[in-house]
A protein has these predicted regions:
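Hydrophobic transmembrane alpha-helices of multi-pass small-molecule transporters
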Residues: 107-108, 169, 176, 185
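Membrane-embedded alpha-helical bundles of polytopic integral membrane proteins
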Residues: 1-131
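Juxtamembrane boundary at the C-terminal end of a transmembrane helix
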Residues: 182-190
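A short, terminal or domain-edge coil/loop segment
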Residues: 35-43, 118, 143-150, 179-181
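Juxtamembrane helix-loop transition sites at the ends of transmembrane segments
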Residues: 93, 120, 162, 173, ...
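A general structural signal for short secondary-structure boundary/capping elements
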Residues: 110-112, 178-181
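Acidic (Asp/Glu-rich) catalytic motifs at the cytosolic membrane interface
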Residues: 68-84, 88, 97, 101, ...
Length: 190
């Protein structure tokens, strides 16, 4: 059902993008590719949030947001407080290795509190998902930074002053959702 809808939607987006690309004579292949990847990035990754909601453990949908936001929040504060060693200066000069570790701890803290109150029988699983989710969130954030640098932009928008657009706030969520979905499937198979 819902997986077929996702596949059909992706095929339609790819076809529409190709038709559009062939009809615009001056369209650069790089621009067309970036547009297509951007659409697939948002649609495919965000659809995993819907897939998590369809699982037997739909409460675990919160792990996507807690892992990503716990990572972002704690990485920021730990990085500001004690960050000395640059994580990946050519992509994101303000990120530090200390902040990255703080991000993992933040994800574990947020997801651990959630598990304690909502899924006490799954605390260990939620902690593992928190670590995996945090690492993926940070790679996702760096991948989004690389994409923005390639396109020559600082932020995806300017809706939130100093923070960019909505997509800038949710890029780590988008990367985290598929990984957490597959972690949930793996845990449910055990």
């Amino acid at each position: 059902g819902h997986r077929l809808v996702c596949v059909v939607w992706i095929v339609l987006v790819v076809m529409a993008s190709m038709i559009y690309g062939f009809n615009v004579e001056e369209r650069k292949l790089q621009d067309m590719t970036a547009t297509l990847l951007g659409i697939l990035y948002v649609v495919f990754f965000s659809f995993h949030i819907v897939l998590i909601d369809q699982t037997a453990d739909s409460d675990l949908i919160w792990l996507v947001f807690l892992a990503a936001f716990g990572t972002d929040i704690m990485a920021y504060f730990v990085g500001m407080a004690i960050g000395k060693h640059k994580l990946c200066p050519h992509l994101s000069p303000k990120k530090s290795k200390e902040g990255a570790v703080g991000g993992v701890l933040g994800s574990v803290l947020f997801c651990g509190i959630f598990a304690y109150f909502v899924k006490p029988d799954m605390i260990a699983e939620c902690m593992v998902i928190a670590v995996v989710g945090s690492v993926v969130a940070q790679f996702g954030d760096l991948a989004a930074s690389a994409f923005k640098r390639q396109m020559g932009i600082k932020d995806y928008g300017n809706l939130i002053p100093g923070h960019g657009g909505i997509l800038d706030r949710f890029d780590s969520v988008l990367f985290t959702a598929p990984m957490i979905y597959y972690c949930i499937l793996f845990v449910n198979e055990m």
